Amino acid sequence: MYGAILGDIVGSPYEFDCNNYKAKDFPLFSRHSDFTDDTVMTLAVAKALLSTRGQDDAAIKAALVREMQRLGRAYPDRGYGTHFGGWLYEDDPQPYQSYGNGSAMRVSPAAWLAKNMAETLHLARLTAEVTHDHPEGIKGAQATAAAIFLARTGHGKEKIKAYVERKFGYDLSCTCDEIRPTYHHVESCQETVPQAITAFLESRDFEDALRTAVSLGGDSDTLAAITGSIAEAFYGVPEELRQECRKRLTPKLAKILREWESVLYNEKICGRI
């Protein structure tokens, strides 16, 4: 999860068109670098999935709703969208046909706990459907999770690109240099996930992946969170960046991250963790 969280933190000062910085030479961290709803919801998904391993879909979805509402209410001012912000406080929360990129930004834990691609896609669907039950919202989560799963199980970038294009129909032919000049703040999966995957595909290492994603502009924290989640699985995350990540979280959130790390380490889950 470090990849998603670091992408969120690094991208946070540059979110929205008025703050976009369309180059790579920016300070990776500043006093404005902070976690947002992307981090909170990723950790909520992780906690829910860890607590329901081996249980049925209904139990998993119930846990997702419970943990997302619990953590979301604990951190209320972290940039939630209008619909989602209302959903957090509903007594009987229902999905609302969203195709926003929130489904993709929070999905990474599903790709680490899954044992194969079929399970990856199934868990990704479940994490999306509790809010983002529009086909594009589900597709964005599944495409992101699939890329993470392929990356963490040793597949190369060409394989990842080909699978995403074939399975999900995303056009990954444009380069970042072609995307950057006209790209602007947009929050749909279909206009965020392909760009985030492209940023990963063009990157040289983990840090460069984050810088490339942020340099595209747009919804920079979410874009970088998605890119970072794939880049972590492919490159790993340098220890100094892990330390920086941990110190920018609250004790409550850092505890969830430690629990997550412990499970991946103890179970020797495949990947560059």
Model region roles, listed by residue range:
Residues 1-273:
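Structured, active/binding-site neighborhoods that engage oxygen-rich ligands
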